[in-house]
Amino acid sequence: MVTLNNIREAQARLNGIAVRTKLLEPHIHENGEADKRKLFLKPENQQPIGAFKLRGAYNKVASLPPQERQHGVITYSSGNHAQGVAYAARAMGLKCVVVMPDNAPATKREATKALGAEIVVVGPGSKERQLKAEELAAQHGYAIIPPYNDEKIIAGQGTI
């Protein structure tokens, strides 16, 4: 279970990495009258990769003990998480492999490659991506950085 302390630890790891985005409260008017509801926006597109996924990915990679990440990291994602892991790996001087579906947008593949990741393309199924990442991790000793359902990923995202 992720605790507030886990999120604070993640925040410390992300200090100087993730942009501290402002909380915006736009004034909404409907039919000329101020709306009583509150709406808040957090412009996470200001992060270095253009998405909040940097937070969880970086926290997870930075949390790995040196012996677990010595051969590099691998993830399976079709976009923003892939870029977050690639960004974190580059910042830490690690090899990064990303398993992406063949239907991932070319812009996502190119952005991930531009961050230094090696791209492995598989079919469109999410289970197929995960299995390929697990296979490559076992063969090469890569640390798996899952795109979700991981306490370090969740704690990092919680710093938003």
Q: Language-model features: where?
A:
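PLP-dependent amino-acid enzyme catalytic core
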Residues: M1-I160
